[in-house]
Structure formats: structure tokens, C-alpha cells
């Protein structure tokens, strides 16, 4: 990520404003940096090149992620401002808004290299927003979700963009699961960075330049949380409190699950289940892929190949199996299909920005996709599972 002709950077500091738990820095060219104390160990950094911040909203954060802090003090120095919690020191340069972060023992945990900068993208009508940081000698990096690479991500570049990549090989990227959170570990300590941006994002862990780690996005904001901790486990715990903890999984979900693409009939499913029991292979669940459906229509059964799903599920239950049936949120465009008709009439499907319904190719062919943004669509969708639950799923 070398410097490009149309890359832009913050100018020298113009003014500073205090807003409760946030300090806002304004540069002469309109760039803004908001530093927020989320907890004593967690700071949020939010940048804008537009002279204002868009409405603050995130799907990722837990409702109670702001769990309080003892204090957040600001002190002006000759060339910097120092922002302090009991556990962190954040130093902001007046020259460039670059940031350095220190632990409670004064050890340097993380610091900007170029810091925040952006590239104008006339094709998308938005900015490519970027952040580059110094990479310490011997620093290790972990995280990001599904990455078919080394555990330590140093010397690699990745992108996060959910992609259907069955049968992938080593170093294939991007893949299915994308989590814009990574750990940094070096001799001075450890930390985590959560990049809260829903655009296509990229992470370069000292790949292009050996002493620099960068992350950037094709739109939105540089909006990240810096999480300090005495250990990686400690950082993980604070990250979990920030974004929310999942429900405790049932014990059976931790066992062996039999899954493949795909079982074509009820008879085949029962043959597999019987064989697993005959061979005494401990198995807690068996999966039904798309072939159980009628023409790949969600929330339906193929009555020819799965003539009695309720009896099948109950028999599997007697044998000690949980039944897990796939549901893809791609709804076949067919007004004789009740899910499509209902979603269409209630205006629950995704649309293009200029109004027409979005159509995408999924297993049945052309499909509509539910717009899960409104709560009423999520409630409708969850209610569609009732018939399957009644069948014993």
C-alpha cells in the first residue's frame, strides 16, 4: 500500500473539543478524529474526512458494551495531547493526528505509521479509507475468522468479503466467515483491534512493507476499537464483552455431526444413521442439505423423496440424533410459492437503491432475498421455522 498521488492525510491540528467520554480533534483540512473511552482498557478511534460524522450505528456492538471507566483525562503538551485512563495512555500528535498507545506500565503497545489517510474513489463515489500502523520486530498476528493460511498471519494479506468457496485450498481468500478483529502480540505486550466497518475490508500484516501493518475499506469510516490486555485471553474476554457473548451452546452441539452435500432421500438418511449406530461411531446430529426441499424452496419438503419427514425426524430422535436442516435465505421467485408470495406482498425483500427488487442466483435459480434490517422482517422469518419445529426438527 504505497503512497498514491490521490492519497490524502490530516493537516495540522486546529482545535480540540471534549464531549463527556469522547475527545474530538479537528484538523485544518476538515479531518476529524474522535477518541472515546469505552472502558479503562478499551478506546474507540473514529475518523472522518468529511468535516462531520455520520450517524453512529453498528450491528456489531453489544447493547451494554460501554461498561464505564474510572476517568478519562486530557493533557496538552508542546507537540501532542495525552489522553489517559487508569490502564491506557493515548498520545495524539498535533502535526498529523497520529496515535501512539501505551500500557499502564508505560510500554508501547501500538502506534500509527502513516496513520489515517484516504484515497478518493470516483467510481464508487466514496473514499477508500486506510489506517497503517508500525509492525514491531517479531510481532505476531492472529484472527480474522476463516483464513486458510498460517496461524500467525504475519507476511500475509487478506480481504474480508463473504464468499462461497467450497473445496478451497491453502491460502485461498476470501472465504465464508469474516471477522474484522485481530490480535497483535510482541515483546512489549498484546492487544486487539476490531475494525467496525461493513464494506469490503483488507488487512496487510507486514506483507507489502515489512515494518508496517495496514487495514482499509472500500467505503465507510475508519472506526476501530483498541483493546488492551495482560494476555490474549484477557483481550478476547474484553472483545466478547464489546461485541456480545453468544448463548451457551447445548452439549450435543459439541459432538460429532454427520454432514455432507447431500442426502437425496429419506431412505439414504436412515441408512447412514443406522450404519453410524451399527459401527458405534458416536454421532449427535445428522444434516439435511438442499435436496430435502421441493425444488430448493425453503421451508418445504420433497414429498417424493422425503414422504414422511415427521416420522423420519422422530425416528432419528429415538436413535439419538438431532436433525439439522439447511435454510438458505434465497427465496425462489414463484408467486405460487407461499413464502415468496407472502414476502412480496409484505414488501420484505431487498431492493436496489433506485427501487426495483434485487434478484440473485441461488439454488432454485432467480431468488428474492429478505431484507433483515427491519425487525418485522426478522420476526416474520423466524416464524417460518414453526412448521419445521412442529415436525420435530
Where are these regions (language model features)?
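Aromatic-lined carbohydrate-binding/catalytic grooves of carbohydrate-active enzymes
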Residues: 247-393
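Domain-wide signal for the mature, well-folded portions of proteins, strongly enriched
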Residues: 57-62, 85-88, 257
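A low-complexity, Ser/Thr/Gly/Pro-enriched, surface-exposed linker/loop concept
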Residues: 1-16, 20, 36-81
